[in-house]
A protein has these predicted regions:
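Alpha/beta-hydrolase superfamily serine-hydrolase fold, recognizing
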Residues: 2-201
């Protein structure tokens, strides 16, 4: 449970994720886990936190996660050149108005809106990141930024497995019990993540 905005100013969520990563790495024996086989995963804003943390760990020469798994990730506050923000502006459950509201809560008065940690899509370099699984959704206002992030990661030489689930909406991970398509998407991402975690060195 990371500190939420607006009660806590950004980048508090990133700082909390980093503290948790360091704790898990330091106490892996206590938890009975292999510290070299830990992934970072998140959906929506959790995708922002996970991808930004991977960049921080890369730059600090710390142990990288074994893999990244990002579902419909929010990876930039810059909404230019994103047709999906208009074409899916009124799509359940995430609308363009809701996105603007979230932005206003996380970045009140645009404070820290241009912070590098809020915009991994536009990082100077995306090279040197772990194998990444990305699952975007066809009916999602932030579909285009997730697709662009997958493309930039691949162009930067990273191993990327990208699925665009064309018939699904934002938050499809929550709909597995009521939608067969969402259930299949969840299974697809889970299998891909398992394969990355268990791949030979």
């Amino acid at each position: 449970d990371y500190r939420l905005c607006p009660e806590n100013a950004f980048p508090a969520p990133i700082e909390d994720a980093k503290a948790l990563w360091e704790h898990v790495q330091a106490c892996s024996d206590d938890y009975g886990i292999d510290p070299a086989r830990v992934a970072l995963a998140g959906d929506s804003a959790g995708g922002l936190i996970s991808s930004t943390l991977a960049l921080i760990l890369r730059d600090e020469s710390g142990r990288q996660p074994r893999a990244l798994c990002l579902a419909y990730p929010w990876v930039t506050t810059n909404n230019e050149n994103q047709p999906s923000l208009s074409s899916c502006a009124n799509t359940f459950p995430l609308t363009a108005d809701t996105m603007h509201f979230f932005n206003s809560q996380v970045f009140p008065n645009d404070l820290n809106k241009d912070h590098p940690w809020a915009n991994p899509l536009h990082a100077e370099s995306l090279a040197g990141l772990p194998p990444t699984i990305i699952g975007t959704a066809g009916f999602d206002p932030i579909r285009d930024q997730g697709n662009a992030f997958a493309s930039r990661l691949a162009e930067s030489g990273n191993e990327v497995t990208h699925f665009c689930f064309e018939s699904l909406t934002h938050s499809y991970l929550m709909f597995g019990r009521i939608s067969n398509e969402a259930e299949r998407a969840c299974e697809t991402l889970a299998v891909a993540l398992s394969e990355s975690l268990n791949a030979s060195d």
